[in-house]
Amino acid sequence: MTTIVSVRRNNKVVIAGDGQVSLGNTVMKGNARKVRRLYNNKVLAGFAGGTADAFTLFEKFESKLQMHQGHLTKAAVELAKDWRSDRALRKLEALLAVADETASLIITGNGDVVQPENDLIAIGSGGNFAQAAATALLENTDLDAREIAEKSLNIAGDICVFTNHHHTIEELESTVELPKPE
């Protein structure tokens, strides 16, 4: 597996992921790129799960973004519908974390599209560790989104054997003023 974390703070959103690819208990690759920019660099996406499955889903998601002129939520819902109902897609095992300048979403193979509380996403084998770390950093520090994502991935990498310290980090700055969380 892997760890993907997405943090939104002060008009910036970051999706970061480690680079480890495992086959059973063996590390096959340490520098995989599991975070990408899509749709003219306006959407960030990261995956946890099977690599080949995730690349298939990236392609499908990007085509949905094109179809819906970059509208993240519509594209995510359409992908989730296809993923749940298409016999071939249904067998794909991966989770997607996606974000644009206004929304952060988790897309699952069960047909779920979830906008998490506080726009914090952490998925994959080290996701619980990264989420706990990122939550603590969001609530108790003034670190920016990138620093929180990096630190939470490092903590997950120290604990989870399926997460390493080779990170890919992508960041978007929002021009849209978002309401402050209460």
Curated annotation (Swiss-Prot):
Catalyzed reactions per annotation: ATP-dependent cleavage of peptide bonds with broad specificity
Domain of life where this protein originates: Bacteria
Keywords: Allosteric enzyme, Cytoplasm, Hydrolase, Metal-binding, Protease, Sodium, Threonine protease
Reported regulation of activity: Allosterically activated by HslU binding.
Residues involved in Na(+) binding: G157, C160, T163
Pfam families: Proteasome (PF00227)
Gene3D superfamilies the record matches: Glutamine Phosphoribosylpyrophosphate, subunit 1, domain 1
Stored HAMAP family: HslV
NCBIfam families on file: ATP_dep_HslV (TIGR03692), PRK05456.1 (NF003964)
Family membership: Belongs to the peptidase T1B family. HslV subfamily.
The protein, known as: ATP-dependent protease subunit HslV
Lineage: Bacteria, Pseudomonadati, Pseudomonadota, Gammaproteobacteria, Vibrionales
